[in-house]
Amino acid sequence: MKVNKFITIYKDIAQQIEGGRWKAEEILPSEHELTAQYGTSRETVRKALHMLAQNGYIQKIRGKGSVVLNREKMQFPVSGLVSFKELAQTLGKETKTTVHKFGLEPPSELIQKQLRANLDDDIWEVIRSRKIDGEHVILDKDYFFRKHVPHLTKEICENSIYEYIEGELGLSISYAQKEIVAEPCTDEDRELLDLRGYDHMVVVRNYVFLEDTSLFQYTESRHRLDKFRFVDFARRGK
């Protein structure tokens, strides 16, 4: 059976990337150069590049070209409920947390909906960026009920809020409902993160509950899409 030309080109470039011919952050030849190299049409090359992007080999960035992605991504457990400090200890990489906003706020309409909060509830708002190996690649936006977390400081936010909640307040964090989506970057993402031209983020929304089933935290965790993969373990029921 005849194989489409674009699939042949896709496989050839994918093998080159896997073999180290093209390394992470390098830019592939232009569509014009690839058209000449493979003796084919520009549309065929575009189909091959689209397939490479779909399978995580490259990211097409406007004004820059097709950038090879780092396929050795950091793994985030989907089913687990861990703090960034706990995760950082398993990554074996240099990390730093920067607190950009911290304080008590009346809940916005969105947070009222996400936390099932009333307008007169006091809500802690904490916005932090996470720096890994020299790049700010995660933006965490956390919202906690003050009635559950009566005291919070910037120093606690720089270290570990979960460590404080469980160790100092004696609360038992039990489970979370998670939603994972891809969304366009916001102005806030562009301001606080090192996006390197990427225009989409992987967004994880967490609704976190205490042992007594009280919803006490809503988190929006925004990840640069080339840096992470989210993994889970599944077992078939019988």
From Swiss-Prot:
Disruption phenotype: Cells lacking this gene are constitutive in the expression of the trePA operon.
Residue ranges the record marks as coiled coil: none
Conditions for induction: Probably induced by trehalose-6-phosphate.
Sequence ranges assigned to domain HTH gntR-type in this UniProt record: 1-71
GO molecular-function terms, A-Z: DNA binding; DNA-binding transcription factor activity
Keyword terms, alphabetized: DNA-binding, Repressor, Transcription, Transcription regulation
One Pfam family of this chain: UTRA
Function, as annotated: Repressor for the trePA operon. It is able to bind trehalose-6-phosphate.
Protein name: HTH-type transcriptional regulator TreR
Record lineage: Bacteria, Bacillati, Bacillota, Bacilli, Bacillales
